[in-house]
Amino acid sequence: MLTLSDFDFDLPPELIAQTALPERSASRLLEVDNTNPSAPPRLIDRRFAELPACVAPGDLLVFNDTKVLKARFFGRKASGGKIEVLIERVTGERTALAQIRASKSPPPGTTLTLADAFDVTVGERVEPFFTLHFPDNCLVLIERHGRLPLPPYIEHAPDAADETRYQTVFAANPGAVAAPTAGLHFDDAVLAALEARGVERATLTLHVGAGTFQPVRVENLAEHRMHSESYELTDALVEKIAATRARGGRVIAVGTTSMRALEAAARDAQAAGRPLAATRAETDIFITPGYRFRVVDRLVTNFHLPKSTLLMLVSAFAGIETIRAAYRHAIDARYRFFSYGDAMLLTRRDDAAEATHGGA
């Protein structure tokens, strides 16, 4: 049985990208050709701008169109004590769930002043979050007064460049507290080249939660509990997936968030004995080696943290040894890692179930 230690690796800290490159599609792309099960994977170093040459007319790229909220606030209690608030999810026009860092957990009814701009009232606890009641439309107040919640491994304070580059060019639906980072490499030129090549596009929405950065704290992966995130698939997306299948094209997920939404919806549909359909739901799907993929044929993704659930996901998709070889190559070739880093293009290995944990 696989354990957490099976997904550890040594990463030189200087390979953690701290800023975005001047041009989105100037990032590197490691194409991993693992289609021959009797041979080692072929690792091809490219620029991301070459992606259109790596996909075929009739393929379908599925993007996550979530938009990152300016979800981080610094503030104070009425007593003057300092607090830090990270909005996890907007739940209504004037309500949200949030993490609160303070010397002592604020009880219901506590008033907090955020960004020296407005007050919120603490409501009921919804573990591990607090309900916050805003005085006005919370999306407006968050956008006006909040700070971009850069990942914990990015060491600088967010600036004007981050406000552009930590969003995808197709971000449309506010609600995430972390970017769907595989999408950050796409610029208008790459999207136009994909269209010219006859590659279809579709979108879904999965609002990435702060739990995406939470470490796995148990060695036995069966004991890990994933955070829950909300997602939505539309009729238009489902129809495009069916049309792609009918013409022999491949479904290519842009990012692990798109992957998780597609696979969660397909798994739940299969369990209910129905075909994939438009849906709005929550998912805490945890994809590990042994999982049987139902929708996605290829995956565009960044390089992930050691011992992370996302590293487990890509290992399930492409094969553990394939991913280990690709990561060794990426480190040796000085690829940039994590949110502002470079990308990989993976193909599903139907024999990737090198271990049986994960099933379903």
Swiss-Prot record:
<dbReference type="InterPro" id="IPR003699">
    <property type="entry name" value="QueA"/>
</dbReference>
<keyword id="KW-0963">Cytoplasm</keyword>
<comment type="similarity">
    <text>Belongs to the QueA family.</text>
</comment>
<dbReference type="GO" id="GO:0005737">
    <property type="term" value="C:cytoplasm"/>
</dbReference>
<dbReference type="GO" id="GO:0002099">
    <property type="term" value="P:tRNA wobble guanine modification"/>
</dbReference>
<protein>
    <recommendedName>
        <fullName>S-adenosylmethionine:tRNA ribosyltransferase-isomerase</fullName>
        <ecNumber>2.4.99.17</ecNumber>
    </recommendedName>
</protein>
<comment type="pathway">
    <text>tRNA modification; tRNA-queuosine biosynthesis.</text>
</comment>
<keyword id="KW-0808">Transferase</keyword>
<dbReference type="GO" id="GO:0051075">
    <property type="term" value="F:S-adenosylmethionine:tRNA ribosyltransferase-isomerase activity"/>
</dbReference>
<dbReference type="InterPro" id="IPR042119">
    <property type="entry name" value="QueA_dom2"/>
</dbReference>
<keyword id="KW-0949">S-adenosyl-L-methionine</keyword>
<dbReference type="InterPro" id="IPR042118">
    <property type="entry name" value="QueA_dom1"/>
</dbReference>
<dbReference type="InterPro" id="IPR036100">
    <property type="entry name" value="QueA_sf"/>
</dbReference>
<keyword id="KW-0671">Queuosine biosynthesis</keyword>
<comment type="subunit">
    <text>Monomer.</text>
</comment>
<comment type="function">
    <text>Transfers and isomerizes the ribose moiety from AdoMet to the 7-aminomethyl group of 7-deazaguanine (preQ1-tRNA) to give epoxyqueuosine (oQ-tRNA).</text>
</comment>
<dbReference type="Pfam" id="PF02547">
    <property type="entry name" value="Queuosine_synth"/>
</dbReference>
<dbReference type="GO" id="GO:0008616">
    <property type="term" value="P:queuosine biosynthetic process"/>
</dbReference>
